[in-house]
């Protein structure tokens, strides 16, 4: 199960604050009717940062590297990691993990965890398939460096690689389906 996305309208019902991590864990335990969670994921980095796999802007002239858009202040990693460590000590979770993190976020979390003698995350979950292989550049090496496992999501590319796009005869996806079908045998 994961924590980050809004679970209500309150300010403490979203993100990676210690309060939300604890509350979301309790809610998940209740919904799952269990006494512990094997792997509890931080679903995104807190603070609205877009990872390289999240929002990609190919229109580079529109990107202002010197004045990034305003983002809410992220919860400090120390607070996030302490909250997960307490849940581990309480037996409510066995392991923490990350999802949709950039390689430099993995490095931040692992270095902070190591400096405080916390277990830290044990795996990263990222989109990975034959058509989306960007994680091979930095994320997989970071996971290797810090000893994290890798759990791919969308291994069939949302149906792209499983033949689901064959049925589209017109529209936006029809051209993509044609290319996939043409190259399927390769």
Q: What are the residue ranges of the model-derived segments?
A:
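A short, structured active-site edge motif that brings together acidic residues
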Residues: 1-7, 124-127
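Short, acidic/polar
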Residues: 14-32, 77, 82, 106-110
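Active-site acidic short loop of glycosyltransferases
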Residues: 34-35, 93
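Acidic/hydrophobic-patterned starts of short beta strands in beta-sheet-rich repeat architectures
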Residues: 39-40, 97
């Amino acid at each position: 199960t994961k924590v980050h996305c809004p679970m209500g309208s309150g300010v403490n019902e979203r993100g990676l604050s210690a309060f939300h991590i604890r509350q979301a864990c309790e809610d998940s335990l209740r919904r799952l009717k269990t006494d512990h969670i094997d792997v509890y994921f931080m679903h995104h980095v807190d603070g609205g940062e877009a990872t390289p796999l999240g929002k990609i802007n190919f229109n580079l002239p529109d990107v202002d590297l010197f004045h990034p858009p305003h983002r809410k202040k992220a919860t400090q990693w120390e607070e996030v990691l302490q909250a997960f460590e307490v849940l581990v000590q309480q037996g409510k979770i066995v392991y923490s993990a990350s999802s949709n993190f950039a390689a430099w976020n993995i490095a931040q979390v692992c270095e902070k965890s190591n400096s405080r003698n916390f277990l830290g995350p044990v795996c990263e979950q990222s989109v990975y398939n034959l058509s989306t292989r960007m994680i091979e550049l930095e994320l997989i090496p970071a996971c290797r460096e810090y000893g994290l496992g890798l759990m791919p999501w969308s291994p069939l590319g949302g149906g792209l690689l499983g033949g689901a796009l064959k049925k589209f005869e017109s529209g936006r996806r029809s051209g993509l389906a044609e290319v996939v079908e043409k190259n399927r045998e390769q």
